[in-house]
């Protein structure tokens, strides 16, 4: 094989651990964050100052969790540990000290995979990106078009302070967006004299106006300034000097109320070139004076002063699990503080102990609230390993303290030059969240201040130095360096070859000689996220389609027999490993035992290490989690080696779909508008068959009439229907069930009033009490079927926690195999998606010169306008690889190996493949990449040669079985009486505004009238219509829609005298059918029609 053909994966480095961002943050919380909060919280004094309670934060202790991860999932419990802290109660009067270890609450623990188990469900805490605390200088235009400058001091928590200038060169200050105050009033209130201020400013003449303005207002002393400040901040309250001092202290100088945080202090010191110590977290006089000085320099346009870009990643920081949890603990501890103070006041001083004072409930509630209902605590996307991994690396600008979808403008959502190597410019959702939810780039990491860093190699005098570890730079530091991209061509010693190199410097592009380059990127892949880096030939795809490709890989359903891609990018194995879906050995050793359930590795020290495999477990998205061993007894393994394949993995690599033979050609209109024509081979050979596991649950509750019972004795059910139930009335494992079959038999006690008349008659005649129960069994829903995989029974006797009022809970897991069918959605990795329109017998499919029928026929018109040509490169490279019987790894952005390298490489591979014996036909130099196909139905060749090859195609989670839905009668909305919407509500099909236009265009008047009346909210009309249909009579004239009556009532409630009148001017009583309607159900059913109504008149 020619050397030029084999330019494959040379990423230069392995990626860092992809879940590190989650794990490192939680580790910081356990080691520092929690201790920090407990120390800040301590000591607590009572209102008299006699008692003091100290928390010895560094001595906190975590108990071993009650359940392990698997048991917590099984029992619907939380995987959490109990927290204990040593508390010291000091009585200052007597000098008595009581020390005790106190329980302060349960802390959910992170699993090894970076997730949390909350109430049995696996959840992920998404990282949040927020504006960093610090000082920001901005310019604005006032209404006269004059440019004004302002400075905002933003703390981590506390009041914002904003300085601004006006046209008279006066300086004003606002506290938390209140009214403007002369800046010098604040200076005097803070105890600074005129000379203190003037001495600190480089251009005091600008500030002189503000001093004179304050003097003109008669504010000459500190006391007067405090009174003025109090008046402005608390209008309507009587001002006092002490009140002003208290207000100023609590707003800016009280560490409990105002906190810049470590990051805020770091940013302010850096921006204003100060040397205030890191542990001073409140405002200082120096901060305020330096801010005013900087603002004046901006006004006077003096060098060195620059405006801030709030979208720059140097000014936005990431809050990960640890910090979010720390903030929540702070909330809980503040609630606890109030309780402790109250108890100190109320209780007997002598007999009080720390345990009596500390109530764990507020802290438990705060933590529970965060994990259970915070916007950032999300139900993990477990569709496949990539979805799980991407979810853990997601960065959201939404959430508490962040942006909202409605408020976010274009600037926040846009790609910023500082995103380079930090946030992926491609992977983001389509729709309202575009640009607000991002993904961390492959090599990015979050530093101790929460800023995203990315690695570089140092360049010394034109030579790339790859010895040692790469250097990580944050966006601020990188701006001051000249950075070359990762695909710069170098010789084998690392010397840069070109004479002029494109570099990024201060967010602009320049060309400089190699000697001036400071750093070079680590890898061409470091700009993009993990999902995007799995797309081969990415550089040939339009960004919009690459975005769809990245997002759709996360929706790929794990298949029964996954197959890794013929054309990959070299990152597949690391994605599988870091996702946590594959078991990995932590020791060097030998495999001593393997079966489907466990693998035992005997370490070099002689100890046995057990790895238990997941078997057919249900994921959060109802896909199947199953692990299959890939090692044999006697195999030598090394630490970090994969022992088994998880779902959507093969050979330790991620395998989301199948490599199938694809032809790009139109076929009888069946691939019009992105539809896909597939061969029956995909169905018969189970290429795209997947297993889905549904969970069905039923509770036996305590009712007023007695307990519900789970039993086999169900009234009016034939013995045949009970065949698969055991003696308790629960379905046996392994049974095949279809829609309507009983899974769990349950009877509910029935009151006397529930008896139908015939039952009462039987009672009166025979005097015997028939069993007073109603059938309330759990049945398989419509359109569902499958095989019972597992049954779990939960009772209080076994120690299970059940919902209030429930005596027993039974869960049945049903697995179904879903073959590919018409209506399923499929996609490639380049954003080329479509719906299956027809499944053809393989003998009718177009076939190759050697007789092989193709698997999929796609429309060639889907390529040019979408500009995702990467799919064509993948197709031909896959064609060459399958004929050479090898797999290829192609790193994106391969121009570093020479111009047009992708094109040359694919061509060289095809030529190489055609040199195989008997394979000359696979490559035609006259028409490279195309073959003359024949029609399977006639055997005639098609007119034109067709592009054919192997591509990796995925089956997506949007399956037609989950979407198909029909309704004849069903539930109605209570207010409007219109049918509900959606499959889950058994809703109707909405004909919206545009569909109505279409009917209007055809003049379909009666159809339109039915849509507005009997098919919707004409309550009487729809009951009569159903009656007429059942009896075969003509449908009567429709009545008045309920929504019209609601509208009339709403207008009347506004005090408008509005009514409906006939042509003759007679008022129509819209409510005349109210009384008869009370007796008819709002939901027409066949039972509601009495037997007499069926009889012909």
UniProtKB/Swiss-Prot annotation:
The gene is rpoB. InterPro entries: DNA-dir_RNA_pol_bsu_ext_1_sf (IPR042107), DNA-dir_RNA_pol_bsu_external_1 (IPR019462), DNA-dir_RNA_pol_su2 (IPR015712), DNA-dir_RNAP_su2_dom (IPR007120), DNA-dir_RNAP_su2_hyb_sf (IPR037033), RNA_pol_bsu_bac (IPR010243), RNA_pol_bsu_CS (IPR007121), RNA_pol_bsu_protrusion (IPR007644). Pfam families: RNA_pol_Rpb2_1, RNA_pol_Rpb2_2, RNA_pol_Rpb2_3, RNA_pol_Rpb2_45, RNA_pol_Rpb2_6, RNA_pol_Rpb2_7. This is DNA-directed RNA polymerase subunit beta. Residues 1077-1091 have a biased composition (Polar residues). It is an enzyme of class 2 (transferase). It comes from Prochlorococcus marinus (strain MIT 9312). In cyanobacteria the RNAP catalytic core is composed of 2 alpha, 1 beta, 1 beta', 1 gamma and 1 omega subunit. When a sigma factor is associated with the core the holoenzyme is formed, which can initiate transcription. GO terms for cellular component: DNA-directed RNA polymerase complex. Its EC number is 2.7.7.6.
């Amino acid at each position: 094989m020619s050397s030029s053909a084999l330019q494959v994966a040379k990423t230069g480095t392995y990626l860092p651990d992809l879940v590190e961002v989650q794990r490192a943050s939680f580790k910081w919380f356990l080691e520092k964050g929690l201790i920090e909060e407990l120390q800040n919280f301590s000591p607590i004094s009572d209102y008299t100052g006699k008692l003091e309670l100290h928390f010895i934060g560094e001595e906190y202790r975590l108990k071993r969790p009650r359940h392990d991860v698997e048991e917590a999932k099984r029992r619907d419990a939380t995987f959490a540990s109990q927290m204990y802290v040593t508390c010291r109660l000091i009585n200052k009067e007597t000098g008595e000290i009581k020390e005790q270890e106190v329980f302060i609450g349960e802390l959910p623990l992170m699993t090894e995979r970076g997730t949390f188990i909350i109430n049995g469900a696996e959840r992920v805490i998404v990282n949040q990106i927020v504006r960093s605390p610090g000082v920001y200088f901005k310019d604005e235009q006032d209404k006269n078009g004059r440019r004004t400058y302002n400075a905002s001091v933003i703390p981590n928590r506390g009041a914002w302070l904003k300085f601004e200038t006006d046209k008279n060169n006066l300086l004003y200050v606002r506290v938390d967006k209140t009214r403007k105050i002369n800046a010098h009033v604040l200076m005097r209130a803070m105890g600074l004299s005129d000379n203190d201020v003037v001495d600190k400013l480089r251009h005091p003449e600008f500030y002189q106006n503000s001093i004179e303005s304050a003097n003109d207002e008669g504010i000459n002393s500190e006391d007067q300034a405090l009174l003025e400040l109090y008046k402005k901040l608390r209008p309507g309250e009587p001002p006092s000097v002490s009140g002003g001092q208290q207000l100023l202290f609590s707003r800016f100088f009280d560490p409990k109320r105002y906190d810049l945080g470590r990051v805020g202090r770091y940013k302010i010191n850096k921006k204003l070139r100060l040397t205030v110590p890191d542990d001073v977290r409140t405002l200082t006089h120096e901060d305020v004076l330096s801010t005013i000085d900087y603002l004046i320099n901006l006004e006077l346009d003096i060098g060195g002063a620059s405006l801030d870009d709030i979208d720059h990643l140097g000014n936005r920081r990431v809050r990960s699990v640890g910090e979010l949890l720390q903030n929540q603990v702070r909330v809980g501890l503040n609630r606890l503080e109030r309780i402790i103070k109250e108890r100190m006041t109320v209780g007997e001083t002598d007999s009080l102990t720390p345990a009596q004072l500390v109530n764990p409930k507020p802290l438990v509630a705060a933590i529970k609230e965060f994990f259970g209902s915070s916007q950032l605590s999300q139900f993990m996307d477990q569709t496949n390993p990539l979805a799980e991994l991407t979810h853990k690396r997601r960065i959201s600008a939404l959430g508490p303290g962040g942006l909202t979808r409605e408020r976010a403008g274009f600037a926040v959502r846009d790609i910023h030059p500082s995103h380079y190597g930090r946030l992926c410019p491609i992977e983001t959702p389509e729709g309202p969240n575009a640009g607000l939810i991002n993904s961390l780039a492959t090599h990015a990491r979050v530093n101790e201040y929460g800023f995203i860093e990315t690695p570089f190699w140092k360049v010394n005098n034109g030579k790339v130095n790859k010895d040692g570890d790469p250097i990580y730079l944050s966006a601020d530091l990188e701006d001051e360096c000249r950075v070359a991209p990762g695909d710069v061509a170098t010789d084998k010693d690392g010397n840069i070859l070109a004479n002029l190199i494109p570099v990024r410097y201060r967010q602009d592009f320049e060309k400089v000689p190699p000697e001036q380059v400071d750093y070079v990127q680590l890898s061409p892949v470091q700009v993009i996220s993990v999902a995007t880096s799995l797309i081969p030939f990415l550089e040939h795809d339009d960004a919009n389609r690459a975005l769809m490709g990245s997002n759709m890989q996360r929706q790929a359903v794990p298949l029964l027999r996954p197959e890794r891609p013929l054309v990959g990018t070299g990152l597949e194995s690391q994605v599988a490993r870091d996702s946590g879906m594959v078991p990995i050995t932590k020791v060097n050793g030998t495999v001593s035992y393997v079966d489907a359930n466990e693998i035992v590795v005997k370490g070099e020290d002689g100890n046995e290490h057990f790895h238990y495999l997941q078997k057919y477990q249900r994921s959060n998205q109802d896909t199947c989690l199953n692990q299959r061993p890939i090692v044999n007894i006697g195999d030598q393994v090394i630490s970090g080696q994969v022992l088994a394949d998880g779902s959507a993995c093969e050979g330790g690599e991620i395998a989301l779909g199948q490599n199938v033979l694809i032809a790009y050609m139109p076929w009888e209109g069946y691939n019009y508008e992105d539809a896909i024509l597939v061969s029956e081979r995909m169905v018969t050979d189970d290429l795209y068959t997947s297993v889905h596991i549904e969970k069905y649950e039923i509770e036996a509750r305590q009712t007023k009439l007695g307990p519900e019972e789970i039993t086999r004795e169900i009234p009016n059910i034939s013995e045949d229907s009970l065949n698969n139930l055991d003696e308790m009335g629960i379905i046996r494992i392994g049974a095949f069930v279809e829609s309507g079959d009983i899974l769990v038999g349950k009877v509910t006690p029935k009151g006397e009033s529930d008896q139908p008349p015939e039952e009462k008659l039987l009672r009166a005649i025979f005097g015997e009490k028939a069993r007073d129960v109603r059938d309330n069994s759990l049945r398989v829903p419509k359109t569902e079927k499958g095989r019972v995989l597992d049954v779990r029974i939960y009772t209080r006797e076994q120690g299970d926690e059940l919902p209030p009022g429930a005596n027993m809970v039974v869960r049945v897991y049903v697995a179904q195999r879903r073959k590919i069918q018409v209506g399923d959605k499929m996609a490639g990795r380049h954003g080329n998606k479509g719906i299956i329109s027809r499944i053809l017998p393989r003998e009718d499919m177009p076939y190759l010169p050697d007789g092989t029928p193709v698997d999929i026929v796609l429309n060639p018109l889907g390529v040019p306008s979408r500009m995702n040509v990467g799919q064509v490169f993948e197709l031909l490279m896959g064609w060459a690889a399958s004929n050479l019987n090898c797999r290829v790894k192609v790193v994106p952005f391969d121009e570093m190996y020479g111009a047009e390298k992708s094109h040359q490489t694919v061509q060289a591979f095809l030529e190489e493949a055609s040199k195989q014996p008997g394979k000359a036909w696979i490559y035609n130099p006259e028409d490279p990449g195309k073959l003359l196909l024949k029609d399977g139905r006639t055997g005639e060749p098609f007119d034109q040669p067709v592009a054919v090859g192997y591509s990796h195609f995925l089956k997506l989670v949007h399956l037609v079985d989950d979407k198909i839905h029909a309704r004849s009668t069903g539930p109605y909305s209570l207010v409007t009486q219109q049918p509900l919407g959606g499959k889950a509500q058994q809703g109707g099909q909405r004909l919206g505004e545009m569909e109505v236009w279409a009917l209007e265009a055809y003049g379909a008047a009666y159809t339109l009238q039915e849509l507005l009346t009997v098919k919707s909210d004409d309550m009487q009309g729809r009951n009569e219509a159903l009656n007429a249909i059942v009896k075969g009579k003509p449908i009567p004239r429709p009545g008045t829609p309920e929504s019209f009556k609601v509208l009339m009532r709403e207008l009347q409630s506004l005090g408008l005298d509005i009514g409906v009148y006939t042509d003759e001017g007679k008022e129509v009583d819209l409510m005349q059918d109210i009384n008869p309607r009370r007796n008819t159900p709002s939901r027409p059913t066949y039972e509601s029609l009495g037997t007499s109504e069926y009889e012909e008149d």
